[in-house]
């Protein structure tokens, strides 16, 4: 069996959709008319630096994802058995399943992005090396039950959402529990109770939209199960304030039998998440049943680095950065893809390596080994900065 999955916000990058806009000019013109600007110009050149703004990001990703699916059908015509998308990507899954047309889907996404961009006073953070159960426990112990779980991305990658001051207060509690806390650059508390007012506004356009029956089963974010008859409108409304149950989604699909996943659209974030979820999959849990709550397999809460970076601490590397091998690694860094970059860095540079960056004035020291954040970003945590740097932005101090 085959499942096509579509990524959501965070996967965007300048240059996405190259060749697709010219290959599908009719859809591109429709998108330009609905949006009021050139989606091709936004995606390929982004002259006004708007691509990372929510109201522009979401329509751009929707269009590129949709054109990617159309190209897939044009090239080989292989129909999937299931469809799923992460947050925004769910709109592409519904469009691919025939539930909604390209135009109506884009109109919904355009309005969704506009409304979400207006959200204020909210914050989000990714929690690594922490299970859902432990996350809820820590929030309760810290008297921070005002914070919601926004994304269950993998058994040990959770995203929390709430008022900015509450999210900031949560950081020391997670770090004390040896979890990694990564504040996210968002203006709103997406996928939390604080989006309820936004839901009311979004409901106006959703209820005016006609939805058809899917010709392929689509897995809903809010349940991690296939859509039932008549659920589309309410699920899309509720999605704004509900948790994205991505782990449950993949667990359910794995329980259907031998499953092949293919990510369509921008990047491979979901592909990497699926690899990690598979490692925690236990067929005996039978997540195909609505009564069963999937849970991580043995050892999946033990090491964020092992889970995210597919690497290990090299404890016998004593030299800091003076060897010829180290210098050669530095010279080759930009030639490696993110996974290889992480693996090579960890072979040569131990925790505590002194580094410099063009984006920071003083010398920094690594606090962790390198790892993949969100499946695509090679990064390392800095001790005296209390944040992450992309590995391509740092170099060993001389």
Question: Which residues are covered by each model-predicted region?
Answer:
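Alpha/beta catalytic cores of group-transfer enzymes, especially the acyltransferase/condensing modules
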Residues: 9-11, 35-37, 74, 97-241
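Flexible, low-complexity segments
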Residues: 64-69, 73-83, 240-314
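Mixed-charge, Lys/Arg-rich low-complexity intrinsically disordered regions
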Residues: 320-354
């Amino acid at each position: 069996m085959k499942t096509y999955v579509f990524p959501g916000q965070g996967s965007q990058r300048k240059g996405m959709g190259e060749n697709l806009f010219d290959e599908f000019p009719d859809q591109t013109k429709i998108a330009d008319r609905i949006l009021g600007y050139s989606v091709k110009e936004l995606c390929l050149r982004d002259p006004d630096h708007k691509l990372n703004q929510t109201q522009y990001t979401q329509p751009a990703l929707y269009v590129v994802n949709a054109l990617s699916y159309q190209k897939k059908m044009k090239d080989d015509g292989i129909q999937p058995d299931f469809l799923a998308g992460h947050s925004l990507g769910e709109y592409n899954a519904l469009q691919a399943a025939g539930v909604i047309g390209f135009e109506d889907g884009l109109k919904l996404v355009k309005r969704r992005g506009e409304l979400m961009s207006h959200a204020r006073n909210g914050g989000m953070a990714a929690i690594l090396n922490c299970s859902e159960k432990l996350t809820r426990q820590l929030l309760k112990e810290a008297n921070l039950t005002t914070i919601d779980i926004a994304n269950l991305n993998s058994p040990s990658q959770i995203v929390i959402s709430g008022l900015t001051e509450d999210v900031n207060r949560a950081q020391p509690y997670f770090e004390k529990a040896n979890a990694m806390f990564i504040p996210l650059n968002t203006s709103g508390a997406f996928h939390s109770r604080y989006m309820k007012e936004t839901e009311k506004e979004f409901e106006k356009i959703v209820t005016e939209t006609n939805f058809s029956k899917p010709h392929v089963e689509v897995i809903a974010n809010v349940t991690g199960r296939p859509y039932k008859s008549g659920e589309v409108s309410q699920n899309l409304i509720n999605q704004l304030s509900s948790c994205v149950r991505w782990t449950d989604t993949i667990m359910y699909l794995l329980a259907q039998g031998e499953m092949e996943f293919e990510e369509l659209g921008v990047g491979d974030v979901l592909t990497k998440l699926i690899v990690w979820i598979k490692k925690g999959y236990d067929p005996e849990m039978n997540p195909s049943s609505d009564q069963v709550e999937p849970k991580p397999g043995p050892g999946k809460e033990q090491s964020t680095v092992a889970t995210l970076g597919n690497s290990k601490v090299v404890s016998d590397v004593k030299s800091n950065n003076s060897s010829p091998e180290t210098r050669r690694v530095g010279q080759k860094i930009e030639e490696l893809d993110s996974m290889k970059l992480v693996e090579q860095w960890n072979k040569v540079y131990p925790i505590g390596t002194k580094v410099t960056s063009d984006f920071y004035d003083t010398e920094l020291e690594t606090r962790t080994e390198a790892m993949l954040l969100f499946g695509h970003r090679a990064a390392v945590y800095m001790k005296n900065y209390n944040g992450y740097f992309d590995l391509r932005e740092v170099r060993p101090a001389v």
